[in-house]
């Protein structure tokens, strides 16, 4: 019987909390000054690598998002050193930051579904008169 949550998932969950605190309190880079949320962390099985997925409050501006990700990549060594102090791990994983567009895509899909439902309701209330010809 497989474990429901293995060690990589537990470490990723704790790391997500710690990175969020570090970004909130320690990172002073103005490129990351916009509200940054850590939406997820994926760990490799050997806990040596971590993919950190982030979203930004001001994510409509693509240039700002790219600059934010670049700033996080440049600060990854500093973030990694703070993680080493906050968490007791034999190997502090190498961090790679990615922009998580799943929230934006989810909102877009939700809007599409809402529009289709609204259009369908309008068709039911006002059937086309052209069918009587």
Swiss-Prot record:
GO terms assigned for molecular function: ribosomal small subunit binding
Protein's GO biological process: maturation of SSU-rRNA
PROSITE patterns referenced in this protein's UniProt entry, alphabetically: RBFA
Main location: cytoplasm
Record's keyword terms, sorted: Cytoplasm, Ribosome biogenesis
Gene Ontology CC annotations of this record: cytosol
Pfam family, one: RBFA
Extent of the signal sequence: none
Compartments where found: Cytoplasm
Top-level taxon of origin: Bacteria
InterPro entries: KH_dom-like_a/b (IPR015946), RbfA (IPR000238), RbfA_dom_sf (IPR023799), Ribosome-bd_factorA_CS (IPR020053)
Function: One of several proteins that assist in the late maturation steps of the functional core of the 30S ribosomal subunit. Associates with free 30S ribosomal subunits (but not with 30S subunits that are part of 70S ribosomes or polysomes). Required for efficient processing of 16S rRNA. May interact with the 5'-terminal helix region of 16S rRNA.
Family: Belongs to the RbfA family.
Alphabetical list of NCBIfam families matching this protein: rbfA
SUBUNIT field: Monomer. Binds 30S ribosomal subunits, but not 50S ribosomal subunits or 70S ribosomes.
The protein, known as: Ribosome-binding factor A
């Amino acid at each position: 019987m497989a474990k429901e949550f293995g060690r990589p998932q537990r470490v990723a969950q704790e790391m997500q909390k710690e990175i969020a605190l570090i970004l909130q309190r320690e990172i002073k880079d103005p490129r990351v000054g916009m509200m940054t949320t850590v939406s997820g962390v994926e760990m490799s099985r050997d806990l040596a690598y971590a993919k950190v997925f982030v979203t930004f409050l001001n994510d409509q501006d693509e240039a700002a998002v790219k600059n934010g990700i670049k700033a996080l990549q440049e600060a990854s060594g500093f973030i990694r050193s703070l993680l080493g102090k906050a968490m007791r791990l034999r190997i502090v994983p190498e961090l790679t930051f990615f922009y998580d567009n799943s929230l934006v895509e989810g909102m877009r899909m939700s809007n599409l579904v809402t529009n289709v439902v609204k259009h369908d309701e309008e068709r039911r209330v006002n059937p086309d008169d052209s069918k009587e010809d």
